[in-house]
UniProtKB/Swiss-Prot annotation:
The gene is MYB75. It comes from Arabidopsis thaliana (Mouse-ear cress). Induction: By jasmonic acid (JA), NaCl, sucrose, UV light, nitrogen deficiency and drought. CDD domains: SANT. This is Transcription factor MYB75. It comes from the Eukaryota. Changing P37H: In strain: cv. cvi-1. Changing I172T: In strain: cv. C24 and cv. Landsberg erecta.
Length: 248
């Protein structure tokens, strides 16, 4: 676009253009490539001037074939870096990226590429162990039927547990009645025992008092009416029944 619009020259450089570019850089130094075409009086773009200087006209550039040491270093660097020619040329002093690329494509690529291709083919041929595909069991949902089915309900119903299991050979009602009767009899016995104990205590006190009276009063003494102080035994036991005692 730049060459077509401004009529810039393209193609091979002449000796006159090389001398003008060399004089300009020696005078102003490297850099500011956008000003080089104007200062040198060249009808070239700045990119063309820069590449011409770095690849061909720079005084530190080495010309000729690469030495054996340089070829060995080029092979090792190419194994590490690949086709990064600018990085490889930076490690080969005096060699440009264009020179390194041209030398590789002309002398070394045909010797080393077949070996690389064979290695790549061997790598491709080696089978990769593959695990068999697992079968995914798909479970489809089944619609539920809400119709009443006696057979299904009978099968699916949970087992019934009897809260009050029947006793072996016994009737529950009879057992309950017997237990109630037993408790009533037991309460009656306790009540009678308590009454007897209380009556015995009362009787003991009564006998003690009667003995004291016998000591103080002789047995032969009688009342004014002639009655004795002795009590009837039947009247004494009638006290347990709650009846009143009448003295004769």
């Amino acid at each position: 676009m730049e060459g077509s619009s401004k009529g810039l020259r393209k193609g091979a450089w002449t000796t006159e253009e090389d001398s003008l570019l060399r004089q300009c850089i020696n005078k102003y130094g490297e850099g500011k490539w956008h000003q080089v075409p104007v200062r040198a009086g060249l009808n070239r773009c700045r990119k063309s001037c820069r590449l011409r200087w770095l690849n061909y006209l720079k005084p530190s550039i080495k010309r000729g074939k690469l030495s054996s040491d340089e070829v060995d270093l080029l092979l090792r660097l190419h194994r590490l870096l690949g086709n990064r020619w600018s990085l490889i040329a930076g490690r080969l002093p005096g060699r440009t990226a264009n020179d390194v690329k041209n030398y590789w494509n002309t002398h070394l690529s045909k010797k080393h590429e077949p070996c690389c291709k064979i290695k790549m083919k061997k790598r491709d041929i080696t089978p990769i162990p593959t695990t068999p595909a697992l079968k995914n069991n798909v479970y489809k949902p089944r619609p539920r039927s809400f119709t009443v089915n006696n057979d299904c309900n009978h099968l699916n119903a949970p087992p019934k547990v009897d809260v009050n299991p029947p006793c072996l050979g016994l009737n529950i009602n009879n057992v309950c009645d017997n237990s109630i009767i037993y408790n009533k009899d037991k309460k009656k016995d306790q009540l009678v025992n308590n009454l007897i104990d209380g009556d015995n205590m009362w009787l003991e006190k009564f006998l003690e008092e009667s003995q004291e009276v016998d000591i103080l009063v002789p047995e032969a003494t009688t009342t004014e009416k002639g009655d004795t102080l002795a009590f009837d035994v039947d009247q004494l036991w009638s006290l347990f029944d709650g009846e009143t005692v009448k003295f004769d």
